[in-house]
A protein has these predicted regions:
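Hydrophobic anchor at the beta1->P-loop junction of P-loop NTPases
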Residues: 5
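P-loop (Walker A) phosphate-binding loop of NTP-binding proteins
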Residues: 8
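Conserved lysine of the Walker
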Residues: 13
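Hydrophobic positions on the alpha1 helix immediately C-terminal to the Walker A/P-loop
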Residues: 16
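Post-Walker A helix-loop "phosphate-sensing" segment adjacent to the P-loop in P-loop NTPases
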Residues: 22-33
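ATP-dependent small-molecule kinase phosphotransfer cores
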Residues: 32-103, 107
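A glycine- and Lys/Arg-enriched "phosphate-lid" helix/loop adjacent to the NTP-binding pocket
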Residues: 94-157
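NTP-dependent small-molecule kinase module
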Residues: 130-193
Length: 193
C-alpha cells in the first residue's frame, strides 16, 4: 500500500510519517518511509545566512528539480517494496508552492502525476495556520511567516487534485494524528481471510 502525506509546514507530516512506519513495523509489518523534500528549508537558511535569495522562478526551478528526482527515486523504490510505503510529501506540495508564488502549474508536474502510479491513499494533514506557525517556531530549525502558511493552506485546497485527498485533522497531538491515519488505512485495506 502506498500512502502519500501532504500538508503545510508545521502540519506534522514527517512526524506522522515516521510514526506510521514505526507503528506498522511494531505490528510486524514491512514498512518503508520515503521523503520527497525539495530543500526549501536549506535554501531559506542559506538565504538568511548570506542575505540573498533566489527570485521565485529560480527557487521553484531548484525546488522542482530536487523534488522531482526525489519523487522518481521514491516511486522506483516503492515499486520494489512489498509492504506499507509512506511518502512524506509529493509533487502536490510543489504545485501548492507554485500557486503561493503566483507561478503556473507548468506541464512537467501534471504530466508526471498522470504517469506515476497513483497512491492508494493521499492524506492531507490539515492544521490551523496559527498552530502550524507555533510548531515551526518551537522546533527552531527554520522560519515561516503566518501569512505564508495561510496562503499555502489555501493553495493546497485549491488544487484540482485536492479532491482525491482524505483530510485528517492534524491540530491535535501526534498520537491523535496517528490514530486518525490508522483508521483511514484500516478503511482502505482489504480484509484478509
Amino acid at each position: 500500500m502506498l500512502i502519500v502525506l501532504t500538508g503545510i509546514d508545521g502540519s506534522g507530516k514527517t512526524t506522522a510519517a515516521r510514526a506510521l512506519v514505526d507503528s506498522a513495523r511494531a505490528e510486524g509489518h514491512h514498512a518503508l518511509l520515503l521523503s520527497n523534500h525539495a530543500a526549501r528549508r536549506r535554501m531559506s537558511l542559506f538565504s538568511e545566512r548570506f542575505g540573498w535569495s533566489l527570485p521565485p522562478r529560480g527557487a521553484d526551478f531548484v525546488e522542482t528539480c530536487i523534488r522531482v528526482v526525489n519523487v522518481l527515486v521514491s516511486h522506483a523504490r516503492a515499486l520494489r517494496f512489498d509492504g506499507l510505503v509512506v511518502m512524506d510529501r509529493h509533487l502536490y506540495c510543489q504545485l501548492a508552492l507554485r500557486r503561493v508564488a503566483g507561478l503556473s502549474r507548468g506541464r512537467l508536474l501534471p504530466w508526471l502525476l498522470e504517469k506515476l502510479p497513483d497512491p492508494d491513499l493521499t492524506v492531507h494533514l490539515d492544521v490551523d495556520p496559527q498552530h502550524a506557525y507555533e510548531r515551526v517556531m518551537a522546533r527552531g530549525t527554520d522560519h515561516e511567516e503566518l501569512a505564508d502558511l495561510e496562503a499555502f493552506r489555501s493553495a493546497y485546497r485549491s488544487l484540482p487534485e485536492f479532491g482525491d485527498s482524505i483530510v485528517v485533522d492534524a491540530n491535535g497531538t501526534p498520537e491523535d494524528t496517528l490514530a486518525q491515519l490508522n483508521t483511514v488505512i484500516a478503511r482502505k485495506e482489504p480484509v484478509r481471510v
